[in-house]
A protein has these predicted regions:
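Short intracellular "coupling" helices and adjacent cytoplasmic loop segments at the cytosolic face
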Residues: 118-131, 142
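Alpha-helical transmembrane bundle of multi-pass membrane proteins
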Residues: 1-117, 142-440
Length: 440
């Protein structure tokens, strides 16, 4: 193996993966209907983990070839990815473009056509709903352009030139969401699961296939999120995930310690029982994570940013993931070496910390259109309850205009994004008031 070429290839691979991580969730959220947006992204992660499972077992099987000395062990898994990439490159040509991106580019006729194909336009009522949704997107895009200038990545990070849209706050939320995702323990469990099983007293050979089986359970658990994420919302999904994961991590650490003590005392039967209990807790942790925290930190960045900078905003989420994942990947070996099973207690504590953070700082986005979500961040306060109060106030202040069968009035109780949007624009900013007139 040429190490220099392998490192170079890994850098190129990582660059491409980063692009896909930034684009795919945005594309999914912009093409999906608001009532099933979470479901679409959750399905994406089910397939993502399926790829992880295939990769793990492929490498595990190849490791036995040629007594572990043949170059086939690493050449075949690398080459196996090439047909997948060719298929992806060919299929992308047939994917529909995001209607919201087309509106942003001024290609409204194309956006209308694609939106009709995505939502269905077989009946007169369907066509009216499609047209109303398109008008919501157009007016939201016009509002965003009139209220803040084009932003660079640094502008987004520090919130400059964003006015009432508070893009700096949104960037901080998505970056820390991804860092939290890694610190709740998944980086340690997925990458260093064999080490955790070693703490529980398992042999090296057994650790490998137990870790692979854990990935299989991980994949199937993501299906839970497909059916629950849009029903109970993003916040409650994280709540119950943090509780389940925290308990599982604490018990895994406890059982690992008991197993080590039993083995030191010469009681191999008890050591094996405690070790199996620790493995069960790791399985439970991974399953709960797959059903909850795996998807939400990737979905949230794709939802909360304005259309003008949505792709850039999701890129900041990828930055947060890279920081959290890279940090823990380097730190975990040191933590396990010096702290042993106590590392799992740290992960348990991090799960507990995430609950008040989500409650206080992260407004709910479920069952809201991407255009309406902008109003959640019109409040000058960082607290989520203030954002909800401000949203309700904006809706009360504006009169509901008689629009052409508005999607919002047709699919939810009478509320108008346009009326609220006008109220946002009427907010005083630096002593001036901007009036936005709804065009009926």
């Amino acid at each position: 193996m040429n190490h220099s070429w392998m490192i170079c290839a890994r850098l190129v691979n990582g660059w491409g993966t980063g692009i896909l991580n930034a684009i795919v969730p945005v594309w999914a959220t912009e093409t999906a209907e608001h009532k099933s947006r979470g479901q679409f992204v959750a399905i994406e992660f089910t397939l993502n983990i399926l790829g992880v499972v295939i990769a793990y077992w492929l490498e595990y099987g190849c490791s036995f070839y040629g007594n572990g000395e043949s170059s086939f062990i690493w050449r075949f898994p690398v080459a196996f990815q090439i047909p997948m990439l060719i298929c992806l490159a060919a299929m992308v040509l047939f994917f529909p473009e995001s209607p919201r991106w087309l509106v942003k580019m001024g290609r409204e006729d194309e956006a209308r056509y694609i939106l009709g194909r995505l939502r269905g336009d077989s009946s007169h009522e369907d066509k009216e709903l499609v047209e109303a949704e398109l008008q919501d997107i157009i007016e939201s895009c016009q509002y965003e352009r009139s209220n803040f200038r084009r932003q660079t990545y640094l502008d987004m990070l520090f919130g400059t030139r964003s006015g009432k849209l508070h893009t700096g706050r949104r960037v901080q939320l998505v970056v820390w969401f991804q860092i939290m995702q890694e610190w709740i323990g998944i980086a340690g469990v997925t990458i260093y699961a064999p080490t955790i099983f070693g703490i529980a007293g398992m042999s090296p050979a057994k650790r490998q296939w137990i870790a692979g089986l854990n990935n299989v359970f991980y994949m199937f658990s993501t299906l839970i999120c497909v059916f629950t994420l849009d029903r109970i919302g993003r916040r409650w999904t994280c709540y119950w995930g943090s509780v389940g994961q925290g308990i599982a991590m604490a018990l895994a650490g406890g059982f690992s310690k008991l197993g080590q003590d039993a083995r030191a005392a010469g009681d191999l039967s008890k050591a094996s029982s405690y070790g199996n209990a620790a493995v069960a807790m790791v399985y439970i942790f991974t399953s709960v994570f797959g059903a909850t925290w795996l998807t939400v930190p990737w979905l949230y960045p794709a939802e909360i940013f304005p259309l003008e900078i949505r792709a850039k905003g999701n890129t900041w989420g990828v930055v947060g993931w890279s920081i959290g994942n890279g940090w823990l990947t380097l730190l975990c070996p040191i933590m396990f070496q010096h702290l042993g099973e106590k590392t799992l207690y740290i992960f348990a504590a991090c799960n507990a910390i995430t609950i008040p953070m989500i409650w206080a700082l992260y407004p709910e986005t479920s069952q809201r259109t991407l255009e309406e979500i902008n109003l959640l961040f019109a409040s000058d306060s960082i607290w989520s309850w203030e954002a909800e109060k401000n949203l309700a106030l904006l809706k009360e202040q504006g009169e509901v205009p008689e629009r052409r069968n508005s999607v919002l009035s047709a699919r939810r109780p009478s509320s108008s994004t346009d009326a609220a949007r006008g109220s946002v624009a009427r907010h005083h900013h630096k002593g001036s008031t901007v009036e936005v007139e709804s065009k009926v």
